[in-house]
A protein has these predicted regions:
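Short acidic low-complexity segments
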Residues: 54-65
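Cysteine-nucleophile active-site neighborhood
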Residues: 75-148
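Acyltransferase
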Residues: 206, 210-233
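N-terminal beta1-alpha1 ligand-phosphate binding loop
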Residues: 30-50, 215
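Pocket-forming structural segment of enzyme catalytic cores
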Residues: 115-194
Length: 233
């Protein structure tokens, strides 16, 4: 895991990013959706570091000219999807995905791509891009919930462009109690085991999504975000 384990807080991770030389790729306009509870600051910094031109958006019309979209995630499933509805971004996200331009969901932004969640007996419907529901880790495993910290990826779709240069066994950073259960196993790009094995990332067409936080996952995470920017260019 090289230098990963000693960087466990957000401030250290942001400092780690800032102390490296920024990439000089042509700017790609990536819309970073602000729905009021996403982890915007660290995601924005990491995207800028790997060469993206980032536009923080709060309105549906701001997605029109974006080359790619990132839906970040911190907080609850209901808060995310209800905020997207209030800001008229719910339908806008669905429409954007329909255009075939790259879309990245992170953590709750990943969960929101599915139909529903059992979190807090949620009644809110997700974006419904993929069939499936979001479930809580079992209490039978004896492990602490939420999962907070580094864990390994098993890359099951090595041809996925988002995971280029990322071997199985790579460590990434998780903070979550819930995870999606896709109905279609063909969309699963990586798996991770924390008492039970779950889909830690998915890929279908131009949609990529991760339960872990690339912006907190240092070298591996930056490579993933760089791969996403390259898809957007």
């Amino acid at each position: 895991m090289e230098e990963l384990l000693w960087l466990t807080d957000l401030a250290s991770i942001e400092s780690w990013i800032e102390n490296r030389v920024e990439c000089s790729y042509p700017a790609a306009v990536i819309a970073l959706i602000d729905y009021g509870s996403g982890n915007l600051r660290s995601v924005e910094k990491a995207l800028r570091y790997v060469g993206a031109k980032v536009q923080i958006v709060t309105r549906p019309d701001e997605l029109h000219d974006a080359h790619g979209v990132v839906l970040p995630g911190v907080g609850a499933f209901d808060d995310c999807v209800n905020s997207l509805r209030r800001q008229e971004l719910f339908g806008a996200c669905r429409e954007f995905i329909g255009t075939g331009r790259p879309f990245l969901g992170i953590c709750v932004g990943y969960q929101a791509l599915f139909e529903k969640s059992e979190e807090f007996n949620s009644c809110a419907a997700g974006l419904g891009i993929f069939p499936g529901r979001v479930v809580r880790f079992s209490t039978q495993t004896g492990l602490k919930v939420p999962q907070i910290g580094w864990n390994q990826l098993e890359v099951v779709k090595p041809d996925c462009p988002f995971f280029q240069g990322i071997p199985s066994g790579s460590y990434v950073y998780f903070v979550h109690s819930y995870f999606p259960q896709p109905v279609n196993p063909a969309i699963v790009a990586t798996r991770t085991t924390y008492g039970e094995t779950f889909a830690s990332a998915i890929w279908h067409d131009s949609v990529y999504a991760t339960q872990f936080h690339p912006e907190k996952s240092q070298k591996v995470g930056l490579q993933l975000l760089k791969n996403f920017v390259n898809l957007v260019l």
